[in-house]
Amino acid sequence: MKLPIYLDYSATTPVDPRVAEKMMQFLTLDGTFGNPASRSHRFGWQAEEAVDIARNQIAELVGADPREIVFTSGATEADNLAIKGVANFYQKKGKHIITSKTEHKAVLDTCRQLEREGFEVTYLAPQRNGIIDLAELEAAMREDTILVSIMHVNNEIGVVQDIETIGEMCRSRGIVFHVDATQSVGKLPIDLNQLKVDLMSFSGHKIYGPKGIGALYVRRKPRIRLEAQMHGGGHERGMRSGTLPVHQIVGMGEAYRIAKEEMTAEMDRLRTLRDRLWNGINDIEEVYLNGDIEQGAPNILNVSFNYVEGESLIMALKDLAVSSGSACTSASLEPSYVLRALGMNDELAHSSIRFSLGRFTTEEEIDYTIELVRKSIGRLRDLSPLWEMFKQGVDISSIEWAHH
C-alpha cells in the first residue's frame, strides 16, 4: 500500500491507463493529429472520425443522440453556456431563474452574474439532509420563470436530487431544466431518453478522463435554443467555437465507454467500501454524517467530527488525501457554504471531512483510513479544552467568550 492514500476522487481522478494510451495516438506526426474541421485531406477526416466515435461513446452512456453533445473545455464552461445561453435566448419570455444554495460555484456565480444583468434568481434552501423540497420548488415557479438549474449529485455531500420529478414539473410548465451531472455521470444510471432534462453538463476528469474537456447535452426534441458564449469559427453547430482538442475528446470518449461497461459492478464495490468506512468510524462520539446515506452517491462520505478543528484534522491525516469542502473552494478558510445551507453551525461545518472513493481505492486503504481517523480524533480531542468542557457537561454554546 502506497502513502499518501488518495481519497479525493470528487476533486479529480487519475487518468485511467487505458485512456492515456488511447490519447497518445492523437498527438504526434505518427498519430492522428489533424484538425477535425479540415475538410480537404485525410488528416482532417481521420480526426473528425475520432471525434464522432467519442461523441457516440458519451451519448451512449447517458442515452442521448450524439448530435446533442456539445464539447466544451469542462463542466464549468458547460454550466456557463447552459445558464447564460438560455437566459440570453429566452429573456423576452421572462427573466426569472431558480437554483439551489448548494449548487457548485460554476452555477451559483453564473447566476450572480445574471442578477447583475437584470435577471432575478431564487436560491432554494435544501432540507437538513441536502435534498430539495419539491413543494418549495413548485411554489417558487412563476409565469416568467425560464430556467431551473439543479445538480444531480452534490459534490460535497453526495446527495442525489430527484431530477426525474423536477423534470416533469419543469416540462409541464414549459420551463427549461438544466442539470449539472459532473458528479453522477458514470456513477449513477442516466437515461436522457426517459428524463425530461433539457441541458446537462459533463466533465472528463471526474471519471478517469483528462482535465480540460467537458460537454453540454442540448436537447433536440423539444428543441432547446442557446445563445453562444464563445464566438469564432462556428464549431459545434455554432454553440461553441474553437478547434476541437481531439486527444482530449478521444480521452473523454474512452473514459465514458469504460464507465458504461464497468459502472454497475464498480458502484456496488464502492458502496461496500463507503459503508465499511462509515461503519468503522460512526461509533466515535460526536460524529455526524452530512447528507443522506440512503439518498447518496455510493462514492462520497462527508462527516463532521465535533470539537475538532477541520484544518488541524486534515494536517493530522496527512497520510490521506481528503478535503474539507470542494477542491474549488477548500483553499479558503471559510466553512463550506454547502454545509451552512443545511443549517449547520460554523463549528460543525469547520470540522467536516469529505472522503470520496474511486476506481483504485482498496479495502486495505479503507481499513488504514479507519484506524488513522480514530487515532487522530482521539489525539486531537485530548488536546482540546472544548472537548474537556463538553465531557464535563459544560454547555459550550452558553459560554460568553472574551473578545480581544
Swiss-Prot record:
Cell compartment(s), UniProt: Cytoplasm
Modified residues (N6-(pyridoxal phosphate)lysine): 206
Reactions this protein catalyses: (sulfur carrier)-H + L-cysteine = (sulfur carrier)-SH + L-alanine
GO MF terms, alphabetically ordered: 2 iron, 2 sulfur cluster binding; cysteine desulfurase activity; metal ion binding; pyridoxal phosphate binding
Principal localisation: cytoplasm
InterPro entries per UniProt: Aminotrans_V_dom, Aminotrans_V_PyrdxlP_BS, Cys_deSase_IscS, Cysteine_dSase, PyrdxlP-dep_Trfase, PyrdxlP-dep_Trfase_major, PyrdxlP-dep_Trfase_small
Binding residues annotated for [2Fe-2S] cluster, in chain numbering: 328
Subunit structure: Homodimer. Forms a heterotetramer with IscU, interacts with other sulfur acceptors.
Enzyme superclass (EC): transferase
SUPFAM superfamilies for the chain: PLP-dependent transferases (SSF53383)
EC number: 2.8.1.7
Gene Ontology biological-process annotations: [2Fe-2S] cluster assembly
Listed GO CC annotations: L-cysteine desulfurase complex
The protein's required cofactors: pyridoxal 5'-phosphate
Keywords: 2Fe-2S, Cytoplasm, Iron, Iron-sulfur, Metal-binding, Pyridoxal phosphate, Transferase
Metabolic or biological pathway: Cofactor biosynthesis; iron-sulfur cluster biosynthesis
UniProt xrefs under PANTHER family: CYSTEINE DESULFURASE (PTHR11601:SF34), CYSTEINE DESULFURYLASE FAMILY MEMBER (PTHR11601)
Protein name: Cysteine desulfurase IscS
Protein residues bound to pyridoxal 5'-phosphate: 75-76, 155, 183, 203-205, 243
Function of the protein: Master enzyme that delivers sulfur to a number of partners involved in Fe-S cluster assembly, tRNA modification or cofactor biosynthesis. Catalyzes the removal of elemental sulfur atoms from cysteine to produce alanine. Functions as a sulfur delivery protein for Fe-S cluster synthesis onto IscU, an Fe-S scaffold assembly protein, as well as other S acceptor proteins.
Species annotation: Pectobacterium carotovorum subsp. carotovorum (strain PC1)
Domain of life, source organism: Bacteria
Active site: residue positions: 328 (cysteine persulfide intermediate)
Family: Belongs to the class-V pyridoxal-phosphate-dependent aminotransferase family. NifS/IscS subfamily.
